[in-house]
Amino acid sequence: MKRIAFYFSLLLMAMLVLPSCKKGGKSLFTPTSSGNPYEMLVVMDKDMWENRPAGRALFGVLDTDVPGLPQPERSFRISQIGPNHFDRTMRIFRNIIVADIQPIYTQPKLKYTRDAYASPQMIMTIQAPDEASFAEYVEKNGQVILDFFTKSEMNRQIVSLKKKHNDLISTKVGSLFGCDVWIPTDLQNYKVGKDFLWASTNRATADLNFVIYSYPYTDKDTFTKEYFIHKRDSVMKINIPGAQEGMYMTTADSAFVEVADINVRNEYAFEARGLWEMEGDMMGGPFVSHARVDRPNGRVVVVEGFVFAPEKMKRNLMRQLEAALYTLTLPQEHQIEEIVVGAGMTEEKSDTTAR
């Protein structure tokens, strides 16, 4: 009995001591963050949030529509609380923006902290000396704010994909293209063509699809909107037919295709997002593509995610696939750990001694 009591007392002491232990300024028992993907908590005075320019400016940024979707869907689901209510319960939210407006500051500034009170978590603080400069700064940096939290959410998806992804498709992509990519495990069905692979969940609704294809890099106009759409349509017409003869995938109205030059692994990439449709059928949905240059092999490698989800919200489905596009690893590259976020911002290391 004495030995049992001794071991019990040791266990009790460990339970009392360990939660207070620190490693790199953080508790060993960091709680899991609360909230769903693409939910945002804004910490700002209620009157300022609802009635004044500073609040209206921030709401206007966060309440914008996601580009490239057939129906309007907001970038984030937003909640607001006052600073006095930002307690232990609210601090573990996954995405937080804190408005810090004080005359001690000389100019507006963005800074962020990761995993301060929970994990995974991103807290952005927007500092400004007054409300007018806050509003002006937020409006000017609206896309920076959106990209920061969008890519942070995608990084969480990449972490999940690293732990669990479709190994069969990764192996197929390796043998066909000499590349690696992580896609969700439920894309089990696949089709192989010439320099082409298509993986799909093959569901009637909320159908997720991934495509990879390549072609020689020979044209100076390769990374233009017109060239990309022409190449995409020619590849999809051959490889993604419809239910009946004469049906095939094509890009919907090119006027609604948005393109951008982006950075992936510190290398140039061409991004396109828009809508696809099935010629001769009533099917369609959104797509997003990345085209990258594989210089040693003189080719362009394109990865694309597209969704067929009639009467369903598509934001989270598309962003899940978009995160997978960032995991494309060309020959002689190493697999990505995360998308770069917060470039040009100050990252503050968390020291949460009072969780």
Give the location of each predicted region:
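Signature of long, low-cysteine stretches enriched in small and polar/charged residues
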Residues: 74, 78-133, 237-298, 312, ...
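C-terminal motif of bacterial Sec signal peptides marking the signal peptidase cleavage site
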Residues: 17-20
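Secretory pathway targeting signatures of secreted, lumenal, and periplasmic proteins
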Residues: 25-28, 34, 41-47, 184-248
